[in-house]
Amino acid sequence: MPGKKSPYGLFAGGKLKKKRQKFRWNDVTYKRRMLGLAEKYDPLEGAPMARGIVLEKVGVEARKPNAAVRKCVRVQLVKNGKVVTAFVPYDGGLNYINEHDEVIIERIGGPEGKSLGDIPGVRFKVVKVNGVSLWAIWRGKKQKPTR
């Protein structure tokens, strides 16, 4: 009669628990969470928002089946110097952003921290320009301050 894979008995709980723990490392999401890989390679370093300087305006082509040029900006983060692409929301929102403006960016809210919808490789969006909400500027409620 061949041996059993798992111990069984009144005091086998510790051994079973230890064995389960060992096999959890085969799960990709568990491994990434335990090793802190999301924070390690995150440009925002775990923070909800970040401040940056606009380097250039870029147009990102939308994924199929859509045919559009999504307006984005390349932003260099102040905290670590990393350069990321951020989506500019609202119709004509790019008109209120110039190069060398200071912007606040946040995550765009895609699944698993990835890009959202038909915008490939863009994981962030612009929230504020020169300390004023982009939405307020776009609505005409506030004026964009000149620096």
Swiss-Prot record:
Q: What is the top-level taxon of the source organism?
A: Archaea
A Gene Ontology MF term for this entry?
rRNA binding
Query: What's the source species for this entry?
Result: Pyrobaculum calidifontis (strain DSM 21063 / JCM 11548 / VA1)
Oligomeric state and partners? Part of the 30S ribosomal subunit.
Instruction: Recite the UniProt keywords alphabetically.
Output: Ribonucleoprotein, Ribosomal protein, RNA-binding, rRNA-binding
**Protein name, per record:** Small ribosomal subunit protein uS12
Q: Which SUPFAM superfamilies match?
A: Nucleic acid-binding proteins (SSF50249)
- Which GO terms of type biological process are on file? translation
**Designated gene of the protein:** rps12
Belongs to which family?
Answer: Belongs to the universal ribosomal protein uS12 family.
